[in-house]
UniProtKB/Swiss-Prot annotation:
Identification of the protein by name: Uncharacterized protein C211.05
GO cellular component annotations of the record: cytosol; nucleus; precatalytic spliceosome; U2 snRNP
InterPro entries: SF3b5/RDS3-10, Splicing_factor_3B_subunit_5
Similarity comment: family membership: Belongs to the SF3B5 family.
One GO process term, biological-process aspect: mRNA splicing, via spliceosome
Amino acid sequence: MADRLRSQAKLEQLQARYVGVGNAFTTKYEWMVNQHRDTLSSVVGHPPLLAYMATALGEPRVQVRKNLLEKMIMPCGPPPPSNQF
């Protein structure tokens, strides 16, 4: 029983620290947005990954970085309509 409570406490601590971990009320759309933003920020934050993408796309690194930062605003498109009235 103590292990279960300890695991639950650790999960709650992770959820408080990292938004992308989600919780029981996280929607699929929110989870996807968090994953996409995390991936995009990782590429922007690691120069070798950014250089690799720039080479693959055939564009300057500055342009690829700008495009990735713009994509972080709405990485998965507009949110789905809510069912709340």
